[in-house]
Amino acid sequence: MSPQIAVNTAVTRAELLDFISPRHHAIVITTRADGTPQASPVTCGVDDGKIVVATYPERAKVRNARRHPQVTALVLSDDFGGPWVQVDGTAEVIDVPDSIEPLVGYFRSISGEHSDWDGYREAMVRQGKSLLRITPERWGPVATGGFPPRLA
């Protein structure tokens, strides 16, 4: 059996968003007050060219992003051994009531249409949901793990 060779593929912004759109698992990395990294596993989508994450205002990632909006999202494939990409960007935190329509976009980007949008909106208000919206500014290549090519 041939070894799997690591691959790195440079992508444009459009190709990046096409890669991320069907992938909904990510690790968002923010900066704590003491300067150390804080990582949060999240479900993410792409809406209007930005990576979106539903969250709550009291979560560490939200507190950190408000203080230091430069964040990183490591977007993973469903298959852990599948391709992934690191995206660096600026995060914006949107709280209720302004978060409600962006949360609709978040839901649509992951699951499509909801059977009860009024009920969904009411639940988002009741839960006090926030949206973390990350504008991609820099990204690495789409990568896969494996052996270096010299070992092929």
Give the location of each predicted region:
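Short, surface-exposed beta-strand-loop junctions and turns on beta-sheet-rich folds
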Residues: R59-K61, F80, P148-P149
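Alpha-helix boundary recognition
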Residues: I20-S21, R66-R67, V125
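Short, hydrophobic alpha-helical packing/hinge segments within bilobed ligand-binding/sensory domains
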Residues: L16, K61-V62
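A short, aromatic/hydrophobic, helix- or strand-capping loop or linear motif
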Residues: T30-R32, L76-D78, E113-R121
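Short, basic/aromatic recognition patches
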Residues: S2-I27
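Charged, gly/pro-rich active-site loop segments
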Residues: M1-V11, P83-A152
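Short beta-strand segments
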Residues: R23-P57, R63-A65, V71-V75, W84-V87
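Generic structural signal for secondary-structure transition and capping sites
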Residues: H24-H25, Q70, S115, W139
